[in-house]
Amino acid sequence: MIDKTAFVHPTAIVEEGAVIGANVHIGPFCIVGANVEIGEGTVLKSHVVVNGHTKIGRDNEIYQFASIGEVNQDLKYAGEPTRVEIGDRNRIRESVTIHRGTVQGGGLTKVGNDNLLMINAHVAHDCTLGDRCILANNATLAGHVSLDDFVIIGGMTAVHQFCIIGAHVMVGGCSGVAQDVPPFVIAQGNHATPFGVNIEGLKRRGFSREAITAIRNAYKLLYRSGKTLDEAKPEIAELATQHPEVQPFVDFFARSTRGLIR
């Protein structure tokens, strides 16, 4: 079903069964599959392919040669009807690829709201992106990677399968991330190592001086105190009882499965 206010260029192909919302713009030579739903106000510039069981929200901008919902690159995939879900107000630039999930990984690749995926970024099967993340040019997320909110992944950086990247993390360009990165941390290198707290990012997002100081103290306990992780955890948990801004560290430790970058 195509809403009467939507525009579909004469050279575009929209397969029967697709649901195209109000004021959607589908540009030249785009292909939209039968099991695709595109929300109100979303724009497909040109030569965009949206395939599979894919749901795209409102007011997204998707640029030339982006491929969304295509068959993933997991050799175990056997054609199951797995999905991609994309939220609202995302900017998906040229040649970005976002692959459908796998049964083994829960069947869903999910992108939240207000993200920027720059040219040639790759989001593999079963990845989850929060809100307001940035993937710079040629950044690559392997399967099952999870990014919390406000994460920045630098250009040419690769993130290993199943890694978790905490909120407000910034990973520098040309890095290789092989383990989980706790929230608020700046990481760089191959293999990526911690380089301090993302202070400028926290200031821009309205964190108070007191909150940033508490986060830095938690970081010091984790990385500069000489304590093991098991020794640092209870002290960070105690700090979180006095400063709620530290609680994301505690929550992250409970989720981490690959160990932390050191």
UniProtKB/Swiss-Prot annotation:
It catalyses: a (3R)-hydroxyacyl-[ACP] + UDP-N-acetyl-alpha-D-glucosamine = a UDP-3-O-[(3R)-3-hydroxyacyl]-N-acetyl-alpha-D-glucosamine + holo-[ACP]. PROSITE patterns: HEXAPEP_TRANSFERASES. InterPro entries: Acetyltransf_C, Acetyltransf_C_sf, Hexapep, Hexapep_transf_CS, Lipid_A_LpxA, Trimer_LpxA-like_sf. GO terms for molecular function: acyl-[acyl-carrier-protein]-UDP-N-acetylglucosamine O-acyltransferase activity. Its main location: cytoplasm. Its EC number is 2.3.1.129. GO terms for cellular component: cytoplasm; membrane. It is found in: Cytoplasm. The keyword DNA repair does not apply. Pathway: Glycolipid biosynthesis; lipid IV(A) biosynthesis; lipid IV(A) from (3R)-3-hydroxytetradecanoyl-[acyl-carrier-protein] and UDP-N-acetyl-alpha-D-glucosamine: step 1/6. One of its GO terms (biological process) is lipid A biosynthetic process. It holds the Pfam family Acetyltransf_11. Keywords: Acyltransferase, Cytoplasm, Lipid A biosynthesis, Lipid biosynthesis, Lipid metabolism, Repeat, Transferase. SUPFAM superfamilies: Trimeric LpxA-like enzymes. Belongs to the transferase hexapeptide repeat family. LpxA subfamily. HAMAP family: LpxA. Homotrimer. Involved in the biosynthesis of lipid A, a phosphorylated glycolipid that anchors the lipopolysaccharide to the outer membrane of the cell. This is Acyl-[acyl-carrier-protein]--UDP-N-acetylglucosamine O-acyltransferase. It comes from Klebsiella pneumoniae (strain 342).
